[in-house]
């Protein structure tokens, strides 16, 4: 109070007022503070003070021709007095209003194109639906998320080249546009932005938003795709969440999602082939996602998921140094260990050889629905702090950590034999054996683990063997926390190696990933995934395998035909016939193959015997390892549409139908392509060549017994008659000539006679 009174007294003296309002401030420190540098020290004050003046704005002299001196209300818009220290005009804020109402208009056509990301965001929000607000504890964990919906996936350098080329095409500097996406985008944007009057710098900024993925490390409780992240501030607080459904999709989320599905399908398929690594690479290189080559997407897309990372490792790309076990991403935060192989007995007295990690280590574990911090020593879990969305998710994390700890009581909790196999029917390694076992049923594991009394610690509670919460007791070393554990934030990538069986190791030889870690979850891709590789034919079921196999033969018929006659073994070993084998009943595979190969050999031996349609039809059956047997077949079975369907060795069937008139083949009613050559030309030669040395007497005559196959004819004595099966299942009566002299004329007459006999 005293001070205020004193000030009042001072202010009442006119001299004080004069000093405060008129004298200059000449204290150097103060002058320095407010005048050093270009940075405005008190922008709000400066703005208020400027706007209080009559003419706070300066403009180019040309403004005097473009704006009247006074507006309709007679208020002055600009001052005739020059701006001190420049040849600019002093302008009133009212001039801006006048300009906005009456000034020239420009074309707005480019705005939606340049500010595309903003316009699209408005649309998504307009069509999105916001649900109720729920108040509850939010378990948020920091994850690296994409904050920029609707972007392409160019690297900063690639984007820079595109932007320079589009916005400043005449600037000097070498720009190399190499990738397909760069070229497409550049062409598209140049067309869109012709005669664009928006400031080039603005256009460049907006293009950057469209081309480059921007990620931030943010606390998230719900969806992590970019259309959820853009409304993060609306959907989750510290103690509340609001339900939200986005009003649109964006390509980058679709690409991320479809990439994961494609990678999972490819890894699962590669796992069961003879050479998993080679197959995986072949599939990655021949697959397209939304019309873009998968390998290009893998090079640019930073998505971290087990299958995606295996594909990246196979391509020689760097990946994150964290490793995966039981679907959780483990990152070692401190400590170290050495590996030693030890043998131990399960509760069922089965011997397991396990690589034991000796030493103290700490890890963070991050999964889709639960996270944890794990501290362990050699074969001992010291502490596990876990948090998750629900009981089930927490239990999953606890099982993984218990198995990972390699504790003896976990191994002794095994009941029954461990004989889990992967898709290729190979036994899983011991750690994954244990994991699968307890994921099926962890009751014994939790019961045998042991419990301990707990102290009351803020934000932590105990969890009992039946997975119910408790404040008194808890599984030994295990606590449940309200707080999530953040994902590993570093974007550091390391060089890795991959072996034939798709196990990915870091340079120290630690396994980071293996196909066992790839999720079995099936999703539906948002973008079209086109697998050109024959190994992926079966992804759409048996029918697709059947159609694709025959389509492939017809497409490559010229090359196949030559191989068929010169190097059949090479042909039979082609991987394009692999998927087909799964359609042939196991018991019959070898017999069918032996039968078809013998038939083909006869066609080759007897010069000119060649029936295109029949070769195409039977070729896939010859690919299996053949069994030597005398079995003859009139039809071969394939398992499609849930049952066995028959392919007739001679003649058409619903499965394989060749239309002579249109020369088109339909497989299960689906068009499989057209034969370019005329099969009949080939067929004519077949019969004539086969029947050299025989006289054709006419149609089949039942008195001479059942129809013989072509190779059975050789057993006939000269002068004997027999029925014989030729070509597309027609039967004619023949007699073996008594003399060999007239054999040559047979081929010409045979062709004519067959036609007569058949018709």
UniProtKB/Swiss-Prot annotation:
Record Gene3D superfamilies: Polymerase Basic Protein 2, C-terminal domain
Biological process terms in GO annotation: 7-methylguanosine mRNA capping; cap snatching; DNA-templated transcription; symbiont-mediated suppression of host gene expression; symbiont-mediated suppression of host mRNA transcription via inhibition of RNA polymerase II activity; viral RNA genome replication
Spans traversing the lipid bilayer: none
Pfam families on file: Flu_PB2_1st, Flu_PB2_2nd, Flu_PB2_3rd, Flu_PB2_4th, Flu_PB2_5th, Flu_PB2_6th, Flu_PB2_7th
InterPro entries, sorted: Flu_PB2_2nd, Flu_PB2_6th, Flu_PB2_C, Flu_PB2_CAP-bd, Flu_PB2_middle, Flu_PB2_N, INV_PB2, PB2_helical
GTP-binding among keywords: no
The entry's keywords: Cap snatching, Eukaryotic host gene expression shutoff by virus, Eukaryotic host transcription shutoff by virus, Host gene expression shutoff by virus, Host nucleus, Host-virus interaction, Inhibition of host RNA polymerase II by virus, mRNA capping, mRNA processing, Viral transcription, Virion
Any one GO molecular function term: RNA binding
Protein localization: Virion; Host nucleus
CC per GO annotation: host cell nucleus; virion component
Keyword flag rRNA-binding: no
Residues under site feature: Avian adaptation: 627
Motif Nuclear localization signal, residue numbers: 736-739
HAMAP family (alphabetical): INV_PB2
Family: Belongs to the influenza viruses PB2 family.
The protein's assembly and partners: Influenza RNA polymerase is composed of three subunits: PB1, PB2 and PA. Interacts (via N-terminus) with PB1 (via C-terminus). Interacts with nucleoprotein NP (via N-terminus).
Function as written in the Swiss-Prot or TrEMBL entry: Plays an essential role in transcription initiation and cap-stealing mechanism, in which cellular capped pre-mRNAs are used to generate primers for viral transcription. Recognizes and binds the 7-methylguanosine-containing cap of the target pre-RNA which is subsequently cleaved after 10-13 nucleotides by the viral protein PA. Plays a role in the initiation of the viral genome replication and modulates the activity of the ribonucleoprotein (RNP) complex.
Protein's name in the database: Polymerase basic protein 2
Gene: PB2
């Amino acid at each position: 109070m005293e001070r205020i009174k004193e000030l009042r007294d001072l202010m009442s003296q006119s001299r004080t007022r004069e000093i405060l309002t008129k004298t200059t401030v000449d204290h150097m420190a103060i002058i320095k503070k407010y005048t050093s540098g270009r940075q405005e020290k008190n922008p709000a004050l400066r703005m208020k003070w400027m706007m209080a003046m009559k003419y706070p704005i300066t403009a180019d002299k040309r403004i005097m021709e473009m704006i009247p001196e006074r507006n309709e209300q007679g208020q002055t818009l600009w001052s005739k007095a020059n701006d001190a220290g420049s040849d600019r005009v002093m302008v009133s804020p009212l001039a801006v209003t006048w300009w906005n109402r009456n000034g020239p208009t420009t074309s707005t056509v480019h705005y939606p194109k340049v500010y595309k990301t903003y316009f699209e965001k408005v649309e998504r929000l307009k069509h999105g639906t916001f649900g109720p607000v729920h108040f509850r504890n939010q378990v948020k964990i920091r994850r690296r998320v994409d904050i920029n919906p609707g972007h392409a996936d160019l690297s900063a350098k690639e984007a820079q080249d595109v932007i320079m080329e589009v916005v400043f095409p005449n600037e000097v500097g070498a720009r190399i546009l190499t990738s397909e996406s760069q070229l497409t985008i550049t062409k598209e944007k140049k067309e869109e932005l012709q005669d664009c009057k928006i400031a080039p710098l603005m256009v460049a900024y907006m293009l950057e938003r469209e081309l480059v993925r921007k990620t931030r490390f943010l606390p998230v409780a719900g969806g992590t795709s970019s259309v959820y992240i853009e409304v993060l501030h609306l959907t989750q607080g510290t103690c509340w969440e609001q339900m939200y459904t986005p009003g649109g999709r964006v390509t980058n989320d679709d690409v991320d999602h479809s990439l994961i599905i494609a990678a999972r399908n490819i890894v699962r398929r590669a796992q069961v082939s003879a050479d998993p690594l080679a197959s995986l690479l072949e599939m990655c290189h021949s697959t397209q996602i939304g019309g873009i080559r998968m390998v290009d997407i893998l090079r640019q897309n930073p998505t971290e998921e087990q299958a995606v990372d295996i594909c990246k490792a196979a391509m020689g790309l760097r990946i994150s140094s964290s490793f995966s076990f039981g679907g959780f991403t483990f990152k070692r935060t401190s400590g170290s260990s050495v590996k030693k192989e030890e043998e131990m007995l399960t509760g069922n007295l089965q011997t397991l050889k396990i690589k034991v990690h000796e030493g103290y280590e700490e890890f963070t574990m991050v999964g889709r629905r639960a996270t944890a911090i794990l501290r362990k020593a050699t074969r001992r879990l010291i502490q596990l702090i876990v948090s998750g969305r629900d009981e089930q998710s927490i239990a999953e994390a606890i099982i993984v950590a218990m198995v990972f700890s390699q504790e003896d009581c976990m191994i002794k909790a095994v009941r029954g034999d461990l004989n889990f196999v992967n898709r290729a029917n190979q036994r899983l390694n011991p750690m994954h054996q244990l994991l699968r076992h307890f994921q099926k049923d962890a009751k014994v594991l939790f019961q045998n683990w042991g419990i301990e009394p707990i102290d009351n610690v803020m934000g932590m509670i105990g969890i009992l063997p039946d997975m119910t919460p408790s404040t008194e007791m808890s599984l030994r070393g295990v606590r449940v926390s309200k707080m999530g554990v953040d994902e590993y934030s570093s974007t550091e990538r390391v060089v890795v190696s991959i072996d034939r069986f798709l196990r990915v190791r870091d340079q120290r030889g630690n396994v980071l990933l293996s196909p066992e870690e790839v999720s079995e979850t099936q999703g539906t891709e948002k973008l079209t995934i086109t697998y050109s590789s024959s190994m992926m034919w079966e992804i759409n079921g048996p029918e697709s395998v059947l159609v694709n196999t025959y389509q492939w033969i017809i497409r490559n018929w010229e090359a196949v035909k030559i191989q068929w006659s010169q190097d059949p073994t090479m042909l039979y070993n082609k991987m394009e016939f692999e998927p087909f084998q799964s359609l042939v009943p196991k018991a019959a595979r070898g017999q069918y193959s032996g039968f078809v190969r013998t038939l083909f050999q006869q066609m080759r031996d007897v010069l000119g015997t060649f029936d295109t349609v029949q070769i195409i039809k039977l070729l896939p059956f010859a690919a299996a390892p053949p069994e030597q047997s005398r079995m003859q077949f009139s039809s071969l079975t394939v398992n499609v549409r849930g049952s066995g369907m028959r392919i007739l060795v001679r003649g058409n069937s619903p499965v394989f139908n060749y239309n002579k008139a249109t020369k088109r083949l339909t497989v299960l009613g689906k068009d499989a392509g057209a034969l370019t050559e005329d099969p009949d030309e080939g067929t004519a030669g077949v019969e004539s060549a086969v029947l050299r040395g025989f006289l054709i007497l006419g149609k089949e005559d039942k008195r001479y017994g059942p129809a013989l196959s072509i190779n059975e004819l050789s057993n006939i004595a000269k002068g004997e008659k027999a029925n014989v099966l030729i070509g597309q299942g027609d039967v004619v009566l023949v007699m073996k000539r008594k003399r060999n002299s007239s054999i040559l004329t047979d081929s010409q007459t045979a062709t004519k006679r067959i036609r007569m006999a058949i018709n």
